[in-house]
Amino acid sequence: MASNTLIESTSLRRSPAEHLAEAMAQGSTAGAVVLREIAFATQVGVRAVPGSAGHAALAAALGTGLPQQVGEVAGAAEGTAVLWLGPDEFLAIAPEGSGLAGELVAALGGEPGQVIDLSANRSVLELSGPAAPLVLRKSCPADLHPRAFGVNRAIATTLANIPVLLWRTGEQSWYVLPRVFFTEHTVHWLIDAMTEFASPTVA
């Protein structure tokens, strides 16, 4: 009798922007603005009604709690973070290889709610450097001033006429999360918008 063997391997994986890595590196300027991909980040969609047993169980399992209002992020980019998408909808982001989805499913148990692995749904691009907000302002309609958009806040907005999640992860760093099929468009737009910052300083 023939037998089937399942071999798990990460060597054949390709991230959404892997083929654009060289272009991103060439378009970046150290000390001004740098673009790179955060490949294979774990992304888990979570839904639970605030105040419910399921909501409490998920908040505890995440270790960060769940954000309570628009723009709020629980946790931080260095570990597990949870972005507010709606009153009962959240996106948890964790490092590559995290078993977060399984942990949350187990925590939810039979309580009403939803946990879905969305790791292949969006790419994660990091734009960093003092010129990063200037690049984003060329096409993002959101108010990016620090008074309105502080560190560790995230919103749904548009960039280059496509919907993205925009998360300010640090004083000079931002995560841009487009749907996977918009990754190439987003990367090329960002590289083009970064071009002026690669020009030599005019004396």
Curated annotation (Swiss-Prot):
Domain of life, source organism: Bacteria
Catalytic function, reaction form: sarcosine + (6S)-5,6,7,8-tetrahydrofolate + O2 = (6R)-5,10-methylene-5,6,7,8-tetrahydrofolate + glycine + H2O2; sarcosine + O2 + H2O = formaldehyde + glycine + H2O2
InterPro entries per UniProt: SoxG, SoxG_het, TrmE/GcvT_dom1
The UniProt record lists the keyword Oxidoreductase: yes
GO molecular function, one term: sarcosine oxidase activity
Keywords recorded for this protein, A-Z: Cytoplasm, Oxidoreductase
The EC number(s) this enzyme carries: 1.5.3.24
Annotated Gene Ontology cellular component terms: cytoplasm
Family classification: Belongs to the SoxG family.
Function: In the presence of tetrahydrofolate, catalyzes the oxidative demethylation of sarcosine to yield glycine, 5,10-methylenetetrahydrofolate and hydrogen peroxide. In the absence of tetrahydrofolate, catalyzes the oxidative demethylation of sarcosine to yield glycine, formaldehyde and hydrogen peroxide.
Quaternary structure (record): Heterotetramer composed of subunits alpha (SoxA), beta (SoxB), gamma (SoxG) and delta (SoxD).
Protein name, entry field: Sarcosine oxidase subunit gamma
Gene source species: Arthrobacter sp
Gene: soxG
